[in-house]
């Protein structure tokens, strides 16, 4: 939740193929996508981008960077992404597959010395796009639910509207980087994130209140990572330690009103509560040695 959002204020995107667990830990067996945010400029900068398209699409971003002193810089970015829906919910009248997102980010860099820098950043995002409800590809076979297939694949008959679709996420980070000498650098990354979301999930995509799931999700996580980086003529790499404390809470109903009526159990539903806490730590290292200009040998491990 809170992860599938448009990306802005990014310098580059790195697609890392294959297992990346040595450096990035859990859930990276198939690879990782790394977003590198744009650093702050020593010169005043301002950039504006606007994109327009069909379905009344208007996307806009504003980014700015300002050097306050020779050693202190601040920056900010805001973004808005809006588009009408491709389809329509024939029951509620809402647009289906629309987009309504807002995001903002502020950052600051402070050079405490020529070889020591602090970087702080905070971000906020809000997604109020309607829930993307499903489209049935075959008609129902059981009366009285003989609904014909809709002509537009983007249209839906989902009737659940107990909660609105809403995803709100925010977080911050503090990075300290100390260049000890030409070869060694110490880097510390402190971060916190939190998100809250509500989502109406209509599994049968029909107006009847059956297999309808209004869901609420809340997540937060704190992480700390300390790295010792080495850069030499042929050998490059790092060793580090990592700690994560995360919590995830979920509350959702499975509304089974139609099934309950058939079973003489009016108002049948199954309510589920979930609360998961995760605390994890690791030590890791990864080094690459250049054998020639074309060949290199990498060795890494994580515990």
Residue ranges and their predicted role:
Residues 1-17:
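Short acidic/polar hinge/loop motifs at secondary-structure boundaries
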Residues 7-11, 22-89, 94-104, 112-116, ...:
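Outer-membrane beta-barrel translocator/receptor signature
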Residues 15-16, 44-47, 86-92, 152-160, ...:
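Extracytoplasmic loops and strand-loop junctions of Gram-negative outer membrane beta-barrel proteins
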Residues 12, 32, 47-49, 59-61, ...:
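Membrane-embedded beta-strand positions in outer-membrane beta-barrel channels/transporters
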Residues 17, 37-39, 230:
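Flexible glycine-/small-residue-rich
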Residues 90-96, 108, 243-303:
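Signature of Gram-negative outer-membrane beta-barrel scaffolds
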Residues 48-52, 76-82, 120-124, 190-192, ...:
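Transmembrane beta-barrel strands of outer-membrane/channel proteins
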Residues 71, 93, 99-238, 244-247:
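Outer-membrane beta-barrel domain signature, strongest for Gram-negative TonB-dependent receptors
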